[in-house]
Amino acid sequence: MKLGVSTSLFLDTDKNLSDALEILEERVKYVELGCDGNLNVMSDGNIELAQSYDLKYTLHCPITDLNLSSYRERIRKVSLDFVRDVLEVAIKVDAKLIVLHPGYCVFKYDYEKALNSLIKSLNDLNNIQEEFGVQITIENMPSYDMFMFRNPDKEIIENLGELKITLDIGHSFLNKNIENFLKISDKIAHIHIHDNNGEFDEHLCIGKGKINFNNFKKDLKKINAIKMIELQNKSIDDLDLCIDNLKEILR
């Protein structure tokens, strides 16, 4: 059973990366490292720190600043350059894969340009993946209009090439498309798991929202991917309960 927890649980708390890894090493074998805030693995000394633990890692690219869907070419290219920086860190900590947000488009008028930019970025990312030898995955996004890849759109899926998907169950529930994503399970290499009440992206403990995981637990079990719990700091006290609930689902 490949079960892990993201360090995002400790974002904006008084915990540093060492504190987070100490807590998680007692509970799981897989941990998702981030590149933001107090847990930024790219900060001085944190790469060596991560290397010192007996853990297997995935790596989440920065949540902010990057936009692979920007039709402003300089911004798109700088975003790709930063992905290269993240991949260098991934190699150093022996990360299995990296997770990348697809970008955003604020104005509907610009959507087609943004989609074309994203497709161009997917092509570039295939070349970058081949260069670094680390699997790149694109995460499906929650139900806010500005985000790209909220649904398994044909134009995006057909242009993934050798890239894979990180299926975020909570995001998919908000978009009412869990089944649609599970139909392309061969494209899924990684799974983010958390709960919500169907209104916004709460990142709750499994069982504390409205997602009926039993409806698709057979499909989850069949997918050869790390099931990565991704909670927010308001759910720190629920960590052990969430791990137990996920184990029960995957049993």
Swiss-Prot record:
Give the signal peptide as a residue range, or say none if absent.
none
Q: Which residues cross the membrane?
A: none
Family, as annotated: To M.jannaschii MJ1311.
Q: Which domain of life is it from?
A: Archaea
* UniProt-listed InterPro entries: IolE/XylAMocC-like, Xyl_isomerase-like_sf, Xyl_isomerase-like_TIM-brl
> What taxonomic ancestry is recorded?
Archaea, Methanobacteriati, Methanobacteriota, Methanomada group, Methanococci
Q: Which organism is it from?
A: Methanocaldococcus jannaschii (strain ATCC 43067 / DSM 2661 / JAL-1 / JCM 10045 / NBRC 100440) (Methanococcus jannaschii)
Q: What is this protein called?
A: Uncharacterized protein MJ1614
